[in-house]
Design a protein with these regions (language model features):
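Hydrophobic alpha-helical core bundles mediating ligand binding, dimerization, or RNAP-core interactions
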Residues: 77-80, 121, 146
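Non-membrane alpha-helical structural segments and their capping/turn regions in soluble enzymes
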Residues: 74, 114-122
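Conserved donor NDP-sugar-binding/catalytic core segment of glycosyltransferases
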Residues: 1-20
Length: 189
């Protein structure tokens, strides 16, 4: 087995299980890809996988990352595609073996990190696009889902900027209103 994928508990305010609706069993690369395409959810998190070391290293080298590139966002999605295409035998286990605690203050939920998240998503997309001769339906699904995430981050970033502009205008308005009232107050004997 080159890659073992399993279900996980994901906790936030309530406990839930990440379900992919994939039958437990051993798959070859193509069969597993077809199962993922049916669910339309690659579930690319690395914490729900056990990977053979040589497959992991080959997948990482396949990305051909430059040393100056540092990625804190979407790195799981970046590595997931080469891992999947390099794994000949994949076993899917329906039993949850891991509990992931969602941190509300993490980089993915931090409004101040939106601009960095957008840039890192763009880097991940560009690195994935640079992989040669490996364009499969799974590749296009991952690119599609990453572009949707990127669009959401960009919309949140733009919304935040609009809210910030509105906030600044509101402060200025209140400031001038205060000055005007102070001016009128000083006119009254």
């Amino acid at each position: 087995i080159d890659l073992l994928c399993f279900e996980a508990f994901i906790t936030n305010a309530k406990k839930s299980i990440k379900k992919l609706n994939i039958k437990q069993g051993k798959y070859n690369n193509k069969e597993f890809t077809m199962q993922i395409l049916k669910t339309k959810n690659p579930f690319w998190t690395m914490w729900a996988k056990i990977i053979k070391k040589d497959i992991y290293l080959k997948a990482f080298n396949m990305l051909n990352l430059k040393k100056e590139i540092k990625i804190n966002m979407a790195e799981d999605a970046l590595l997931y595609y080469p891992l999947t295409i390099l794994s000949n035998e994949i076993f899917y286990l329906t039993q949850p073996l891991y509990t992931q605690h969602v941190n509300s203050n993490s980089i993915t939920n931090n409004i101040n990190s939106l601009e960095a998240n957008i840039q890192e998503h763009k880097i991940v997309l560009n690195v994935l696009k640079s992989i040669k001769n490996k364009k499969t339906p799974l590749y296009f699904l991952i690119i599609y889902l990453l572009k949707i995430q990127l669009l959401k981050y960009e919309q949140n970033f733009n919304k935040r900027n609009i809210n910030l502009i509105y906030y600044k205008i509101n402060i200025l308005y209140q400031k001038y209103q205060f000055k005007w009232k102070k001016f009128l107050y000083n006119l009254i004997p």
